[in-house]
């Protein structure tokens, strides 16, 4: 209240009231500017998400499904992956066992 009393003594009640009103008006305008900025940022994010992120993800899924995904469903490739995978797990300290499906042999 010391600042208010000093302003009242030096400037009078009219100018002090005017300064207070101008201060509140400045705070109001600052709030409106921030609100407009947040609204613009929200619209920008929504635009990029709608027109870039979602179509990009769907396009990537589509390309994967009809290119690499189709190749991965090849039974010959699956047989190679399954049969050449070590039969004793990931972190086993024993030497890996590999199975040769074409010759029905087990290698270690």
Curated annotation (Swiss-Prot):
Residues 88-108 are annotated as: Disordered. One of its GO terms (cellular component) is membrane. Residues 1-10 are virion surface. Residues 89-100 have a biased composition (Polar residues). One of its GO terms (biological process) is disruption of cellular anatomical structure in another organism. It is a single-pass type III membrane protein. Homooligomer. Interacts with the M membrane protein in the budding compartment of the host cell, which is located between endoplasmic reticulum and the Golgi complex. The cytoplasmic tails of both proteins are important for this function. Interacts with Nucleoprotein. This is Envelope small membrane protein. It comes from Avian infectious bronchitis virus (strain Beaudette) (IBV). The gene is E.
